């Protein structure tokens, strides 16, 4: 899906890591939530409250669950799922565009 219809977009950006990661929240009529964002090059650690699906729209990155030994590479058009109440790491070599879906 390349666009969303009939949604509410929160104007104020979610800013993380001194501005290197920024996203906007998109709310759907059924109560679901997504964020659309950009990550600049860097190494990041994120924690989750709910399960999430990270879809990479452009760029590539490596990711792993905290404590795992192996990094996984993912690129544009691919996605990965993160369990609720967990921590994951990302290595982003160049700007990456993403859509994060929050699973209730």
Curated annotation (Swiss-Prot):
Catalytic activity reported: a purine D-ribonucleoside + phosphate = a purine nucleobase + alpha-D-ribose 1-phosphate; adenosine + phosphate = alpha-D-ribose 1-phosphate + adenine; cytidine + phosphate = cytosine + alpha-D-ribose 1-phosphate; guanosine + phosphate = alpha-D-ribose 1-phosphate + guanine
Major enzyme class: transferase
GO CC terms: cytosol
Pfam family, one: Ppnp
GO molecular function terms noted in the UniProt entry: guanosine phosphorylase activity; purine-nucleoside phosphorylase activity; thymidine phosphorylase activity; uridine phosphorylase activity
Domain of life: Bacteria
Keyword annotations from UniProtKB, A to Z: Glycosyltransferase, Transferase
EC number: 2.4.2.1, 2.4.2.2
HAMAP family named among the record's database cross-references: Nucleos_phosphorylase_PpnP (MF_01537)
Family: Belongs to the nucleoside phosphorylase PpnP family.
Function: Catalyzes the phosphorolysis of diverse nucleosides, yielding D-ribose 1-phosphate and the respective free bases. Can use uridine, adenosine, guanosine, cytidine, thymidine, inosine and xanthosine as substrates. Also catalyzes the reverse reactions.
Official protein name in the record: Pyrimidine/purine nucleoside phosphorylase
Naturally occurring in which organism (per UniProt): Pelobacter propionicus (strain DSM 2379 / NBRC 103807 / OttBd1)
């Amino acid at each position: 899906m390349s666009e969303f219809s009939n949604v509410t977009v929160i104007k104020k950006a979610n800013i993380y890591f001194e501005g290197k990661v920024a996203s906007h929240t998109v709310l759907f009529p059924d109560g679901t939530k997504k964020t659309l964002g950009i990550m600049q090059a860097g190494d990041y650690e994120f924690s989750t409250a709910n399960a999430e699906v990270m879809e990479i729209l452009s760029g590539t990155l490596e990711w792993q669950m905290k404590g795992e030994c192996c990094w996984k590479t993912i690129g544009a058009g691919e996605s990965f799922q993160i369990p609720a109440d967990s921590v994951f790491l990302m290595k982003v070599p160049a700007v990456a565009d993403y859509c994060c879906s929050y699973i209730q």
